[in-house]
């Protein structure tokens, strides 16, 4: 997130959209919940970042949940606690929480930051 914070900080007066997000998913492996959707206007490219608290049923193996921004994903061995991820994209960009186990439930609470670059 340090790199993302530095980039956003250098954008100066740019309008950074900040959206609080929260979601929980349970069920089979592969189940997911969309935390936020960003519609990037045609001809524009945006930086989208997510920062927040990941709470997974498992956090020490390949069963830990993942955060996605578009096709960019958080490492599958992410630990519970504060995590961050950034993506540069166009078109429709979804921020999702995806399960990798069928046991328990996974949740995420944080913020999505989006800005035209």
Task: Name each model-derived stretch.
Residues 4-117:
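Extracellular jelly-roll beta-sandwich "head" domains, especially the C-terminal globular C1q domain
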